[in-house]
C-alpha cells in the first residue's frame, strides 16, 4: 500500500496494476492479435495510475485485426500521482494494424494535481483502407508542466489517413503540447491535431501537419498562448 509498483500485466486486454502511495503504475498489456477473418484485434490494457508519488503506467498496444477487420485500440496511459513532482502521465498505447481500419491510439495520462507533464498520446495504427486516429496528449499539472504531444494519425493505404491527436493543456507555467500529424492516405491525408493551450507563462502548442494524399489533410490550429504573456507566447524561455 505504501511502497511498490503495480505489476506489469501481459495478458489479452490486461490492465496494469495500480501503484502504492510511492511507486509507478503498471504497464497495460498488449491486446491479442486476431488470426480469424472478420474478428477484431484485442484492445490494449490501460496503464495503472500512481497514487501520490510516481509516474503513470504506459498503455498497452492494440492487437492486429484479422482479415477484413478492425484492429484493436491502444490502452490509455495511467495518471501520475497527485503529488508526483516532474513525473509524466503514462504514454498511450499505439493502435494495432488492421486489414480494414487501423486501431486508435490510447490517450496519454494526465500529470499529478500540481506539478508534472502530460503523457504522450498514442499513435493511430496502419490500415489497409483507413488509418486509425492518433490520441490526445495528457494535461499537465495545475502549476508547472507542459501538455503531452498528440499522437500521429496512422496511414491508410487505399482511403484516408487518420487524424492527429490534440496536444494536452499546459499548467500555469509551461507550454501546450504539440498536435499530432495527420497520417498519409491513398485517397486523402488525415488532418493535423490542434495544439494545446497555455494558460499563464508559456506558449501554445503547434498544430500538427496535415497528412499527404490525393487531397492533403488540413493542418491543425495552434494552441493559444498564455494569458500572462499574450497570444504570441515567449519563444525560447521554456523547454
Indicate where each model-derived feature is located.
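Long, compositionally biased tandem-repeat segments
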Residues: 1-239
